[in-house]
């Protein structure tokens, strides 16, 4: 794997990367494959977890991170992505980019000669999902016979999680209102891959039905960056899809709750559930560091 834009790029390497993440977290793996390497971090969208975890992780692996806001680059003044890619490939050893459009990252990959890692696009968020899988593995031991329910908007996180669940053999249900389903092509691909791992992928509009026998409940904000003009309508439509104690009680007794953050407490999840004993949210957030270090390690150790 040279680049990571989609979970599909890591289809055959998911478990290997998770093993590296566990080893880095425990301290068993101490090698620093980024020594004397410079990693550019381009941000077209604001970030807390992605920026801090990558910056710290690059340092811990021996490298030097360079924060590059899109407004500080000539991209902001109309320089073609092709030209930017060719030039940055001469200066840097790798790029992590948090972009507004997935197509822009694909173009960056096309003209770069160095590894490109997506820190989020409007289509997928693979780095987040590696942290999620690491968290589920830590809490549940393995993925077989486990059921995760993603509740809310079928967004970029949901898209990547569908593919990941199919690859590792975990059952996944997306509980969402009609019209807010995940990407159709990704959903179809995930269902095809799930057949190979004897897992099930499905969409359920009835959230109460969806959470039955769930091992993991997962949610994200109802209004993503760029959807602010739909805020009132989305809040009305998604209101029945809130993770609260009542909904949580319908899942397994030992079910855990996950959220990729930032959260709007009182909307997609209640404050008491976020800090409850069943919340894995803070371990999940910490695991962004270990998962992203593992991705970098895997790419640059090859």
Swiss-Prot record:
Lineage: Archaea, Methanobacteriati, Methanobacteriota, Methanomada group, Methanobacteria
Pfam families, A to Z: OTCace (PF00185), OTCace_N (PF02729)
Keywords, alphabetical: Amino-acid biosynthesis, Arginine biosynthesis, Cytoplasm, Transferase
Source organism of the structure: Methanosphaera stadtmanae (strain ATCC 43021 / DSM 3091 / JCM 11832 / MCB-3)
Record-given protein name: Ornithine carbamoyltransferase
Role summary: Reversibly catalyzes the transfer of the carbamoyl group from carbamoyl phosphate (CP) to the N(epsilon) atom of ornithine (ORN) to produce L-citrulline.
Recorded superkingdom: Archaea
NCBIfam families tied to this protein: orni_carb_tr (TIGR00658), PRK00779.1 (NF001986)
Binding site for L-ornithine: 156, 220, 224-225
Region forming the signal peptide: none
Family the entry assigns: Belongs to the aspartate/ornithine carbamoyltransferase superfamily. OTCase family.
GO BP of this protein: arginine biosynthetic process via ornithine; citrulline biosynthetic process; L-arginine biosynthetic process
InterPro entries for this protein: Asp/Orn_carbamoyltranf_P-bd (IPR006132), Asp/Orn_carbamoylTrfase (IPR006130), Asp/Orn_carbamoylTrfase_sf (IPR036901), Asp_carbamoyltransf_Asp/Orn-bd (IPR006131), Orn/put_carbamltrans (IPR002292), OTCase_ArgI (IPR024904)
Key word Transferase present: yes
This enzyme's EC code(s): 2.1.3.3
Pathway(s) served: Amino-acid biosynthesis; L-arginine biosynthesis; L-arginine from L-ornithine and carbamoyl phosphate: step 1/3
Subcellular location: Cytoplasm
Positions annotated to bind carbamoyl phosphate: 47-50, 74, 98, 125-128, 260-261, 288
Catalysed reaction, written as an equation: carbamoyl phosphate + L-ornithine = L-citrulline + phosphate + H(+)
MF annotations from Gene Ontology: amino acid binding; ornithine carbamoyltransferase activity
GO terms for cellular component: cytoplasm
């Amino acid at each position: 794997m040279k680049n990571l834009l989609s979970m599909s790029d890591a289809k055959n390497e998911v478990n290997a990367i998770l093993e590296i993440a566990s080893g880095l977290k425990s301290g068993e793996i101490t090698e620093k494959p980024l020594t004397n390497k410079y990693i550019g971090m381009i941000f077209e969208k604001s970030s807390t977890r992605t920026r801090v975890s990558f910056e710290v992780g690059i340092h811990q692996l021996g490298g030097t991170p360079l924060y590059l806001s899109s407004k500080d680059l000539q991209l902001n003044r109309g320089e073609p992505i092709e030209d930017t890619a060719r030039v940055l490939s001469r200066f840097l050893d790798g790029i992590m980019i948090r972009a507004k459009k997935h197509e822009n990252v694909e173009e960056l990959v096309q003209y770069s000669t160095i590894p490109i890692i997506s820190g989020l696009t409007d289509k997928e968020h693979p780095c987040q999902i590696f942290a999620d899988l690491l968290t589920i593995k830590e809490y549940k031991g393995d993925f077989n016979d486990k059921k995760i329910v993603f509740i809310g908007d079928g967004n970029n996180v949901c898209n990547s999680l569908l593919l990941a669940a199919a690859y590792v053999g975990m059952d996944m249900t997306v509980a969402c209102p009609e019209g807010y389903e995940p990407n159709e092509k990704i959903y179809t691909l995930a269902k095809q891959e799930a057949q190979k791992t004897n897992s099930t992928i499905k969409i359920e509009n009835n959230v109460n039905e969806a959470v039955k026998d769930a091992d993991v409940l997962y949610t994200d904000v109802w209004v993503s960056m760029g959807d602010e003009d739909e805020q009132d309508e989305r809040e009305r439509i998604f209101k029945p899809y809130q993770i609260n104690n009542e909904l949580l009680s319908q899942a397994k007794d030992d079910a855990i709750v996950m959220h990729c953050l930032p959260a709007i407490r009182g909307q997609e999840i209640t404050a008491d559930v976020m800090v409850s004993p069943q919340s894995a949210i803070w371990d999940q957030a910490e695991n962004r560091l270990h998962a992203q270090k593992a991705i970098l390690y895997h790419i640059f150790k090859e």
